[in-house]
Amino acid sequence: MKMMNETRGVDKSPPNAQYFANAGREYMEKYGAEARDFAEIARVSHAHSANNPYAQFREVYTLEQITNSPMIHAPLTKLQCSPTSDGAGAAVLVSQKFLDARPHLKDHAILIAGQQLMTDSPQLYSRSAMDLVGFDMSKRAAKAAMAEAGITPKDIKVCELHDCFSANELILLDGLGFCEPGKAHEMVRNGDITYGGKGVVVNPSGGLISKGHPLGATGLAQCAELVWQLRGWANNRLVDDVSVALQHNLGLGGAVVVTIYKRADLKKNSRVSDGEVVKKSQFEYNPAVEARGVSAADGDRVRSKVTRNEWAMGDTEQKLQARL
């Protein structure tokens, strides 16, 4: 807050909105982006979430509606800000040995091909509003993760990034290497952040802005979406012919994690029908396109048959069912 106050000043609007709005303003001043570019990012995010059954918001908004929603901190309006959400996620990690012993799982196993955690460097004190929200550390983490995975930004056709505010998505398009430096707003204007464009499809889930921001579970929500994309299960919003995906998640203060996922069979994804998902999985439905509550039977199915402990579970099951 002290650094922000010394550079851009502080007012009574929400502090996080000020941090990221200031970063957006800096990009506008340096490269010529306009307020409409941030609004267009939000429009795309809300459009994407219409096909995500887990999204907190599934309404589709026009650019005018987004621009005319209440101003939070210029240039960001309400519909360009992520909500605080409730949510949970889980991922199962297995060894290569485990997978090799189960070849029937390989066509929907996803490899963590590269992963890097970075923290703020002395660049944080550059008096840049962009670096204050993680631009520099995101750039370094992305470069290192891609090098580890043996890919370049041009190999990535789908990503989930931390769009807590639309301004952060815009600067990250630049920081993650999806465009030439200073050209992120041109990418947005050309339609290159969504289906049918020439760039990467950003946040097919709707992102934090529209899918929601369950804070501690946000990273796993991003992971789940990209796994479903790479498997081909997200058949109502699939980014076709993809074999690699990027995930970006950050927290101020500051740390960022960038992960590169690949299909374990190294093939490109293809659309999988709901019926095929049922055949290939333990689900009775396709969880990528249909959200269902968890039953007691579902819970029992995944609990250990060898080391389960009824005393440790206590009344957890009853409490969960009551909430659901």
What is the predicted role of each segment?
Residues 7-14, 23, 41, 46, ...:
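Cysteine-centered functional microenvironments
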Residues 40, 71-140, 144, 192-205, ...:
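Condensing-enzyme catalytic core mediating Claisen C-C bond formation in acyl metabolism
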